[in-house]
Amino acid sequence: MKFAEHLSAHITPEWRKQYIQYEAFKDMLYSAQDQAPSVEVTDEDTVKRYFAKFEEKFFQTCEKELAKINTFYSEKLAEAQRRFATLQNELQSSLDVQKESSGVTTLRQRRKPVFHLSHEERVQHRNIKDLKLAFSEFYLSLILLQNYQNLNFTGFRKILKKHDKILETSRGADWRVIHVEVAPFYTCKKINQLISETEAVVTNELEDGDRQKAMKRLRVPPLGAAQPAPAWTTFRVGLFCGIFIVLNITLVFAAVFKLETDRTVWPLIRIYRGGFLLIEFLFLLGINTYGWRQAGVNHVLIFELNPRNNLSHQHLFEIAGFLGILWCLSLLACFFAPISIIPIYVYPLALYGFMVFFLINPTKTFYYKSRFWLLKLLFRVFTAPFHKVGFADFWLADQLNSLSVILMDLEYMICFYSFELKWDESKGLLPNDPQGPEFCHKYTYGVRAIVQCIPAWLRFIQCLRRYRDTRRAFPHLVNAGKYSTTFFTVTFAALYSTHKEQNHPDYKVFFYLWVFFCIISSCYTLIWDLKMDWGLFDKNAGENTFLREEIVYPQKAYYYCAIIEDVILRFAWTIQISITVTTFKPHVGDIIATVFAPLEVFRRFVWNFFRLENEHLNNCGEFRAVRDISVAPLNADDQTLLEQMMDQEDGVRNRQKNRSWKYNQSISLRRPRLASQSKARDTKVLIEDTDDEANT
């Protein structure tokens, strides 16, 4: 592998600009070589002066890069030292509390089952668990910094070696010895000491001296490009997707030849539509994950996933393919129900019952940690006012806004099975009398409108909670206003529908109000998508017209196509309303909803790419590469004060004025070293050495 590719694959994305600009140096060298005057047409002194002038410029650029790297490394090292002192402080406090309560200095007592612990012991147990996670993330940050150190030194060595080869000189090697090999970022070995001390603390204080268990906890995932999935996972993805495609073709033929034309099919479509949307969402999320990895968007950090254990795009494809097969088989079973002894209404219940069991399965199988993470996140979303809202929380709530049809179809299924289904009839399609009342699919009894508002309500209260935590009216209250427009839209749509059915003369008033609020909501959400969520139309965009100053994805056309797509699908409701109002054929609304629901999932799929890109660029601006985890986090007031200081011109950016404050703060974090630190061992991450000149 060429070193340029190796560097690109192994850098920490959030620190990209702080690495040696290896490609720029290569371009300088090759450009100088191509533009050099030929000895055949000019004298030798002119050639020497040309290369001397170039070398002066080249080494000046090297000095700037070296100064940049030294400064960044020193800042991150100081940050790591402060963080380590804080973690030591918290660990020692936990040990002291435990010593006072139990008289035991080790943590072996916590192995008692959690449900047998007192309230104080439960709190202590959670603190120890949080400390383990905090040390694990801190260790990852140390390895990333050590990787930064090694990659930059290798980059200087490679580019100076290339310089000497092209210019046929040894001044590059001399410059490396004089400047690079004595640079603080290379000579400072404190990072190795911190790594060793962290291993010792985790081994002796948190894992009772079991180094193997400690190192398993601290294990760092491979740094660099996404690792290939296991062969069996790849095989299952191909197998499931292939079977799913074949079954879909079979479904089409079965629908044409087996459906009974004297029965309405809409109960069946409404019941199975939600399952299809969920499968589509999982598959598109797999494409999202693949695209983020390829572009260097660190979604693992953004969602605060465990970097040592999370689902890859292949795992998501596997789950989507497997559920897709079950969905197809269940629907086929409904088509062939007349020749089966099993009642038709059993098949949808079996399908969705299995999906629910797959999610809540308590055994540590079938991606247990990922399922538990999702359940915990869903709990946080539905109890939003009582928790601080993180990115993953409001991201999932946004996904639910695009999957509202699933909730409405779930409500319909419950209502249908409760009130409209004829349980004594087991043949044919799910029975539904076209001439009889069909109130489950209408707004008549009010529940449907409430269910339709649930996703928007979740985001609305999340925005209010974020305003409570930060006291910032913009963007949080303004964002809450955006979601509140959904309440008016749904309310007037329900009033229009019910009044029109009952032939009230004022139904047109509600229709105009419905259209008016649809326009307001679409304009509001469209502007928020493009400007706030995606960060586009930045006045400092420069050559990236109508975009932003920095973009991650390689082609500008992606952004322009996404803007057009978002405009079209945000106003797709105009087609739905136009056709529904002007056409009096039955179930036209169902047909339009069935067509546009997958398109809304696709719109959210595109939205995900640029929303996470914008969040990734925010992390890059803060050089945030790992999760911030603490047993004693800042309270809301302290967090707000810190954010305000960061926004001020004389805040944390002005390091000279606040040096005394930082010094005092670092002093307050000091604590006598734990005894376990004297047993530290060295641990290094080996960076592939690409010495072969052909690979540079």
Curated annotation (Swiss-Prot):
GO molecular function annotations of the record: efflux transmembrane transporter activity; inositol hexakisphosphate binding; phosphate transmembrane transporter activity; virus receptor activity
Domain SPX, chain residue ranges per copy: 2-224
Positions where Phosphoserine occurs in the chain: 668
Compartments in which it is found: Cell membrane
Ranges lying in the membrane without crossing it: 366-383
Residue positions, PTM Phosphothreonine: 690
Gene Ontology, cellular component aspect: Golgi apparatus; plasma membrane
Region annotation Disordered: where it falls in the sequence: 672-696
EXS domain sequence ranges: 439-643
Residue ranges annotated as Cytoplasmic topological domain: 1-228, 297-309, 384-388, 472, 535-553, 627-696
Site feature (Gating residue for phosphate transport) residues: 573
Stored InterPro entries: EXS_C (IPR004342), SPX_dom (IPR004331)
Membrane topology field: Multi-pass membrane protein
Function: Inorganic ion transporter that mediates phosphate ion export across plasma membrane. Plays a major role in phosphate homeostasis, preventing intracellular phosphate accumulation and possible calcium phosphate precipitation, ultimately preserving calcium signaling. Binds inositol hexakisphosphate (Ins6P) and similar inositol polyphosphates, such as 5-diphospho-inositol pentakisphosphate (5-InsP7), which are important intracellular signaling molecules involved in regulation of phosphate flux.
Stated family: Belongs to the SYG1 (TC 2.A.94) family.
Protein name, as recorded: Solute carrier family 53 member 1
Chain's gene name: Xpr1
